[in-house]
Amino acid sequence: MMQPIKKIAILTGGGDCPGLNAVIRAVTRTAILKYGYEVIGYKFGYRGLYNNDFVKLDLDSVSGILHRGGTILHSSNKDNLFDYQVEDENGKIVKKDVSDVGVENLKKEGVDALVVIGGDGTLTSARDFSRKGVNVIGVPKTIDNDLLATDVTFGFNTATEIATEALDRLHTTAESHHRIMLLEVMGRNAGWIALESGIAGSADVILLPEIPYDINKIVEKVKEREEAGKQFTIIVVAEGAKPKDGEVVVSKIVDDSPDPIRLGGIANKLAIDLEGLIKNHEIRSTVLGHIQRGGNTSTYDRILSTKYGVKAVELINSNLFGNMVALKGNKVSYESLENVIGHTKNVDPEGELVNTAKSIGISFAD
């Protein structure tokens, strides 16, 4: 028979994302007000679990954070306790499985269940801790919206709204100066932000990781617009977009990261390439970057994050561990962590949204 739950912990891992604080708030308030649990939060993700570095969470500590971006618990995207950098007896940095330290720290603090908020990498470790007997509940987080097991991840709506507003602003300057403007948005393997903001922000060309582009098709679109009396063109490009028979643009390699290859720079490269093909327009590129992650959280994401946080605690109370909360249609449900890891949700090149965009004249340069 399961022991009654008295104390739970929360940690946030991976890149920051609008809605993290809303989840922390919802978990804490539900745990205290509905079930009478004690709540702590580990700082800087799994690093805090390894170092047993935590703070007590109560109603006061989560007051006023619903709208705020980032995470009051801080985060790290470099700390995998199953492959963690430590110093050996010779002072050499080596990678080692130190997950047992995390398990022991949970036991030492009397933590009965752990809520892990993160993307694929963070949730992979959550699954692995579940396999070691830890009572884990996952909450999916990524602005890329690329987790297959849930219809929507929190943070995506906010990021898309920010990208859409950026496109709105670029329109006025592009039209004033007859420029071709490129906006680079996040989207390593999945182009959801570029696709949805491109439709909502009235882009002329959308470039996605899922649809390799032909630069000559972009030139054709610019000429088509010129012939229609439009002397400017707006292009939104996901950071993972690449030309046909080409490669993605890598900005840097982070050796101590579980995900060392960092993309970025495709908009600037494409602007340079286009300058050699289009002579009568200025071409400018803008990288939206981490602006997509920061600032206040949208209304939709505040509500979705709150629903996720409440559901996470309800799963704990029902002893339904080893699961991740997920949105299915309009209902928050759950899915086994064993089934969600490594399964990404990519844009379907033949899907409804791509068809919608093409039907209103948007080019994918394919």
Curated annotation (Swiss-Prot):
Residues of the active site: D144
Gene3D superfamilies named among the record's database cross-references: 3.40.50.450, Phosphofructokinase domain
Compartment(s) of residence: Cytoplasm
Activity regulation info: Subject to allosteric activation by ADP and other diphosphonucleosides, and inhibition by phosphoenolpyruvate.
EC numbers, comma separated: 2.7.1.11
GO molecular function annotation: 6-phosphofructokinase activity; AMP binding; ATP binding; diphosphate-fructose-6-phosphate 1-phosphotransferase activity; fructose-6-phosphate binding; identical protein binding; metal ion binding; monosaccharide binding
Pathway: Carbohydrate degradation; glycolysis; D-glyceraldehyde 3-phosphate and glycerone phosphate from D-glucose: step 3/4
Keywords: ATP-binding, Cytoplasm, Glycolysis, Kinase, Magnesium, Metal-binding, Nucleotide-binding, Transferase
Residues involved in Mg(2+) binding: D120
Binding annotation for substrate: T142, I143, D144, R179, M186, G187, R188, E239, R284, H290, I291, Q292, R293
Positions that bind ATP: G15, K78, D79, G119, D120, G121, T122
Cofactor: Mg(2+)
PROSITE patterns per record: PHOSPHOFRUCTOKINASE (PS00433)
SUPFAM superfamilies according to UniProt: Phosphofructokinase (SSF53784)
Function: Catalyzes the phosphorylation of D-fructose 6-phosphate to fructose 1,6-bisphosphate by ATP, the first committing step of glycolysis.
NCBIfam families registered for this protein in UniProt: PFK_mixed (TIGR02483), PRK03202.1 (NF002872)
Protein family per UniProt: Belongs to the phosphofructokinase type A (PFKA) family. Mixed-substrate PFK group III subfamily.
Protein's name according to its UniProt entry: ATP-dependent 6-phosphofructokinase 2
Organism name: Clostridium perfringens (strain 13 / Type A)
